[in-house]
């Protein structure tokens, strides 16, 4: 209210000058039941009209509440309008600017606890209905069976939910199983499991397996022929090493502390120096 008073003071300085003494006697006049706001409004309405007072004000009126608006009267007017238009129990379904059907809300509600979703096709399918009016003026609808069957036939393929698994299954179902002349069933439609058949007993698999065995056998024989001289050479080298250089490697009774060659008394100096056997020193 302080903002409202400040705006009124700026707009009408002459009126407020006459009421300068009101501020000094605010407390006394409040006790008497007369407020400063009432004084200001009376002074403005006495000298200047409301239209002239708000002539130069373009930003609207700063007010708290509404002028000339009574909630009780407004509700009564709304009730009168509803009575004139008709009963409020009728439900109007409007699609593309045209009323399709008028049904009682109790008999056929749009959204109820049982119906969790609203289907647009159900309203479109009810375009062709047989309407019967009773003495109360309410309209009863009776759908023809042919129209309902056609509408359901159009709606059924649209209600199906397609997933990636179903798309893959459809691609698989297009090609029949050539080896067993059977087509696997879709589990989503018939509730049966899909069985994938292997191609083990086919002629092609036998031919491929025979060729594979032949290739393996030929490779193994060639490798054996190539590796035989190498094996023989390795065996010969091992025998030579055991006999000539390390004769006591395979001996079970030989110990690590024992010396492999014990020199004789006659040739101690030569054997200790050369560590080799000499024919003249052998006893």
UniProtKB/Swiss-Prot annotation:
Disruption phenotype: Erect inflorescence stem growth.
Name of the molecule in the record: Protein TILLER ANGLE CONTROL 1
GO biological process: morphogenesis of a branching structure; phyllotactic patterning
Keyword Phosphoprotein in annotation: no
Keyword terms: Growth regulation
Positions occupied by motif IGT motif: 60-66
Gene name per UniProt: TAC1
Function: Involved in the regulation of inflorescence branch growth angle. Promotes horizontal inflorescence branch growth.
Reported tissue expression: Expressed in shoots, vasculature, endodermis, petioles, shoot apical meristem, inflorescence stems, pedicels, styles and anther filaments.
InterPro entries to which the protein is assigned, alphabetical: TAC1
Membership in a protein family: Belongs to the TAC family.
Domain of life: Eukaryota
């Amino acid at each position: 209210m302080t903002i409202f008073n400040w705006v009124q003071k700026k707009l009408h300085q002459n009126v407020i000058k006459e009421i300068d003494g009101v501020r000094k006697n605010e407390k006394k006049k409040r006790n008497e039941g007369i407020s400063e706001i009432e004084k200001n409004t009376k002074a403005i309405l006495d000298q200047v009209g409301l239209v002239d007072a708000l002539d130069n004000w373009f930003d609207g009126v700063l007010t708290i509440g509404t002028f000339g608006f009574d909630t009780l009267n407004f509700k009564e007017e709304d009730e009168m309008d509803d009575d004139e238009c008709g009963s409020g129990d009728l439900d109007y379904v409007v699609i593309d600017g045209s009323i399709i059907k008028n049904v009682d809300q109790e008999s056929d509600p749009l959204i109820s606890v049982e119906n969790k979703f609203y289907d647009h096709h159900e309203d479109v399918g009810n375009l062709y209905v047989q309407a019967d009016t009773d003495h109360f003026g309410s309209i009863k609808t009776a759908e023809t069976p042919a129209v309902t069957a056609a509408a359901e036939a159009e709606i059924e393929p649209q209600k199906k939910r397609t997933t990636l698994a179903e798309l893959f299954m459809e691609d698989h179902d297009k090609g029949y199983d050539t080896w067993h002349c059977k087509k696997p069933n879709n589990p989503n439609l018939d509730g049966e499991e899909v069985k994938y058949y292997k191609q083990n007993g086919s002629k092609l698999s036998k031919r491929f397996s025979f060729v594979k065995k032949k290739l393996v056998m030929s490779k193994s024989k060639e490798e054996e022929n190539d590796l035989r001289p190498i094996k023989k050479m390795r065996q010969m080298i091992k025998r030579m090493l055991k006999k000539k250089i390390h004769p006591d490697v395979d001996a079970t009774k030989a110990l690590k502390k024992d010396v492999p060659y014990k020199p004789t008394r006659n040739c101690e100096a030569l054997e200790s120096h050369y560590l080799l056997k000499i024919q003249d020193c052998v006893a």
